[in-house]
Amino acid sequence: MESFSELSLQFSQLSMFPFFETAHYLTSVMSAREQAGAVDVASRSPLASWFSSMLYCFGGGILSSILLAEPPVGILSNTTSIILASAVWYMVYYFPYDLFYNCFFFLPIRLILAGMKEVTRTWKILSGVAHAHSHYKDAMLVMITIGWARGAGGGLISNFEQLVRGVWKPESNEFLKMSYPVKVTLIGAVLFTLQHGQYLPISRHNLMFIYTLFLILIKVTMMLTRSTASPFLPLETSLQHILFSRQQIPAEVRESPSSSGDKGKPSKKTLDKDSGEQDNKKDN
């Protein structure tokens, strides 16, 4: 147990720059390139392509700044990160014969990059929770919101990023169809906020290590199996059925629309019977 605690403590002291941050920029820009029409936008408007990629890379910081009424352009003050992300963007889109992109598209390398990106997700959630706590002491809902925004901002502002590329898909709103990264980031924000308030009986570095291992394991599994379904789907379906499903009226109990207006009127069968009796009387 002591060795695990020491390992998790050393893990929590890792520096994200430059290797993990570079992996984050690589995976983010490659994801941006793989969107429909992104390559065409890069050939027609490099500025729009660059801005779109920067939203993928720094969307979390931009969104959290907006929510806390801070200047969203403050992200530009980190010149080193902007230059590094811009260099990655240029290499991914404009390197001759796409050699740079194809090199990092190789599955084993991409698995490593994806795992490193999940490490940065944990750090971003933590920084968001701590940043919100510095503004609003022990405001758990604010801490969860900012941690969520900092860790999954690129997904949460995806509609705005699409507008930059000239695409408008309101049905792809993350609040309507929440993707797995956004869901798991929200769970992480809740866990780290509860731990920060000492509502969870676990140290921060142990929670960081366990949560990051979970992220990496699920991400690698989804990439190897090429699955896009959320691993939380069975639980979500059960909870939705129990808590949020409307009670359905059995079909045999429902009345037809015309039945309410026919109350008090004799049925067609009765009318036919009565008319038949009248005809018999006439014949007699």
UniProtKB/Swiss-Prot annotation:
Biased composition (Basic and acidic residues): 262-284
Location, primary (coarse class): endoplasmic reticulum
Domain of life: Eukaryota
GO biological process terms held by the UniProt record: regulation of release of sequestered calcium ion into cytosol
Recorded topology in the membrane: Multi-pass membrane protein
Residues engaged in binding a 1,2-diacyl-sn-glycero-3-phospho-(1D-myo-inositol-4,5-bisphosphate): K117, R121
One Gene Ontology molecular-function label: identical protein binding
Family to which the UniProt record says this protein belongs: Belongs to the TMEM38 family.
Function: Intracellular monovalent cation channel required for maintenance of rapid intracellular calcium release. Acts as a potassium counter-ion channel that functions in synchronization with calcium release from intracellular stores. Activated by increased cytosolic Ca(2+) levels.
Full protein name: Trimeric intracellular cation channel type B
Protein source organism: Xenopus tropicalis
